[in-house]
Amino acid sequence: MLKEYRTVTEVVGPLMAVEGVEGVKYDELVEIEMQTGELRRGKVLEVNGDKAMVQLFEGSAGINLKNTKVRFLGRPLEIGVSEDMLGRVFDGMGRPKDNGPNIIPEKRLDINGEAINPVARNYPSEFIQTGISAIDGLNTLVRGQKLPVFSGSGLPHKELAAQIARQAKVLNSDSKFAVVFAAIGITFEEAEFFVDEFTKTGAIDRSVLFMNLASDPAIERIATPRMALTTAEYLAYEKGMHVLVIMTDITNYCEALREVSAARKEVPGRRGYPGYLYTDLSTLYERAGRLVGKEGSITQIPILTMPEDDKTHPIPDLTGYITEGQIILSRELYKKGIMPPIDVLPSLSRLKDKGIGKGKTREDHADTMNQLFSAYAQGKQAKELAAILGESALSDVDKAYAKFAEAFENEYVSQGFTTNRTIEETLNLGWKLLKILPRTELKRIRDEYLEKYMPVGEDE
């Protein structure tokens, strides 16, 4: 029998204090009945003796201290999961948002998940093809990896997210591939874009969408990514699927954390974010991976916008510590009309070496990747030199490098948001561009690969 309390003493923002409680536990789900009969939900944030601090999911507007009834349900926040969730759109709390029927759950799972024993983890080693050359060829995504996208305000990260969700697949695998998409604190316009994009391309059939809008309570943003990850864990570890989890925008999630932390009067850390921001983010990112003995896997692509394009801001800074690399979008490339504007030099996939090579992509992948990185870096230096001293001051080799850098940005990096390149097309395009350079400059590629893969014909 659930006890009912009418001892609400204070309401501040999304927080409510209840006195005289017994047997209440941290993170327990709470049901609040308004004097109008309306039901709202919350969770226990803090317990001190017979006092409990409750965090409200739907906001505190209209709560009457005397007539509000509070029931502690004795269980954490859960989501009902089923394979029928594929092809559906839910709000940030897991309720259907597409006018479809309610899901009949196969089971209910705690959204906080369970910690994965490090010994039970399998090392990521299988290539995921996104169809985007700057990722597949140079910053390869591997199954079970967590690879964030660092973007900036106004940059086309939502188009990139939709493209990856639409095109991503595991090569040479019979297992089913699913996408779990969590939109956190986005506008109506962005939500409409994602739903339309998924629907018209057919990608929604293998996807589960969670949409938390900017107008929804900030507290809901803290639950949304956990709803998505719990669904992903169910599909991966119980249904044997390869699941790609895309979360955008992690910055909005961190802002919600800061808002709740301020309401609780906690001592702020850097830039006002709570001191436990690193720990909290790790509870999201560390839910990616592969387990020994399980066919399925969870690969994560969290997307965040860097305030003022600042890589040293606490959110990208701490994210970089936890995740295995980063894909960085460049405002400079965006202004040039290069789409997607991925800046390949500061971008990094720490596990790329594990997912490429013979039997995974192609034997020449590592050599061409190293050569393309080196040539592009030298080409950018040559272009900067030409801007200062004039093109006539460049040697013939420097001119070739400058020409290569221009072609690399316009043909390799820039492909639009609808082109889906296979890994063979990406590698062959790399060879075509390397032909611009004198053969003596290709020092990072083995002679056997030069003979086998270098396009035959007149030098450009």
Curated annotation (Swiss-Prot):
Keywords, sorted A to Z: ATP synthesis, Hydrogen ion transport, Ion transport, Transport
Disulphide linkage map: none
Lipid metabolism in keyword set: no
Pfam families named among the record's database cross-references: ATP-synt_ab (PF00006), ATP-synt_ab_N (PF02874), ATP-synt_VA_C (PF22919)
GO MF annotations in UniProt: ATP binding; proton-transporting ATP synthase activity, rotational mechanism
BP GO terms, sorted: proton motive force-driven plasma membrane ATP synthesis
Highest taxon of the lineage: Bacteria
rRNA-binding found in the keyword field: no
HAMAP family: ATP_synth_B_arch
Its biological purpose: Produces ATP from ADP in the presence of a proton gradient across the membrane. The V-type beta chain is a regulatory subunit.
Family: Belongs to the ATPase alpha/beta chains family.
Protein name: V-type ATP synthase beta chain
Annotated organism of origin: Clostridium perfringens (strain 13 / Type A)
Gene: atpB
